[in-house]
Amino acid sequence: DIFLRWKLAGYKLIQSRDSLCFHFISRGHRSWAKNGVGKDDDMFKFYNNRASRNYLRKWHKWMSHDEYRMPITHPVYNIGFVITDVTSEDFLHFIETWATNIFIDNTICGDRYISKEQPTTKIDLSTRIHNHSYIEQINNDILLYFSQKDFMLNANENSAIITRLTDIIAEGVEDNAEMELGIFKMKTKIVKDISQTLIKV
């Protein structure tokens, strides 16, 4: 996160090939004797997963680097997922991190998910998960409509679309447009990159 924010802020990152530096111990302790050599400690996996999910909540796309390990910047969009036929907290666990907000038709399932997931993040999940009546009030720039039932019929392919959604939008989706891709229907008001607003913590 910090290196991506530096890059977006216009900082020049210089890599020295002839220097010594302290290495963060967060990765140094990832394997303990009790787990065996090369096996990640359970606590490391917990914190790594938690950090990864918070990163996705903010940036909506996993980090990528160039050949010199410099972060590659990408746009971030204010996007809401409008989902029907929601029955599974496990489904929400996957889908929630990839959007700014999600709107679901099963508030009981949503409340159970929030109760379980909230202890793992400082982000107030009640500001991210709403029922359908909040769609106009939240006013996302982009809305993506789909159902859990249709999604699960081809979960691998549909998951791949969700994880590539930022790139798909960046490749040429226009303002005030409607488009369909498989089970997904997208409506846009404005296709606006909000990444610059995420630099300051």
State where each predicted segment sits.
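A short, conserved alpha-helix in the catalytic core of glycosyltransferases
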Residues: 1-20
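Short glycine-/small-residue-rich flexible loop motifs, especially phosphate/cofactor-binding loops
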Residues: 3, 53, 159
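C-terminal, non-catalytic tails of nucleotide-sugar-dependent glycosyltransferases
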Residues: 13, 30-136, 175-201
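Residues that scaffold the ATP/ADP-binding catalytic core of kinase and kinase-like folds
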Residues: 24
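Conserved donor NDP-sugar-binding/catalytic core segment of glycosyltransferases
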Residues: 12, 160-179
